[in-house]
Design a protein with these regions (language model features):
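Histidine/acidic residue-rich metal-binding segments in metalloenzymes
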Residues: 1-15, 19-36, 66-79, 97
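His/Asp/Glu-enriched, well-ordered alpha-helical/loop segment
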Residues: 35-128
Length: 128
């Protein structure tokens, strides 16, 4: 959000690479009128088999693990333009599985296709 304020000061509209938690501040993000690049890198499930380890896991961490796959659908519902990237994935082969997971969590198939094709092309001024 700071980058957008700097851009506004100089009359520049940035394309912002998201951190995966945009769903937490969706109203402020919508107000930026910026386009976003979203990674489909979701948090791994936490190992809570050992009670001693489980006590170090915060509610915030567990909530983010649950909500992260809804990030793209939250931007879609707020009419915020975004494209999807495989950046930050530990294994690029997980891209399709994570895309399917995002669709299960509310992202429409049409918007997913648009976020992979039309939106990136539009941001690069390569879409007719």
């Amino acid at each position: 959000l700071r980058a957008d304020r700097v851009g506004d000061e100089f009359g520049v509209q940035y394309i912002i690479k998201g951190g995966g938690n945009e769903y937490q501040r969706i109203k402020e993000i919508a107000a930026t009128k910026a386009s976003y690049i979203l990674s489909l890198n979701f948090p791994q499930p936490m190992d809570v088999d050992d009670p001693n380890d489980a006590r170090y896991i915060t509610l915030t961490d567990m909530k983010h693990w649950e909500m992260a796959p809804t990030n793209a659908s939250a931007l879609e519902k707020a009419n915020i333009p975004f494209c999807l990237t495989s950046a930050e994935l530990r294994d690029p082969k997980m891209f399709m599985a994570n895309l399917r997971k995002a669709i299960e969590y509310g992202l429409t198939e049409n918007k997913a296709l648009e976020a992979l094709t039309k939106t990136p092309a539009s941001l690069l001024n390569a879409y007719d």
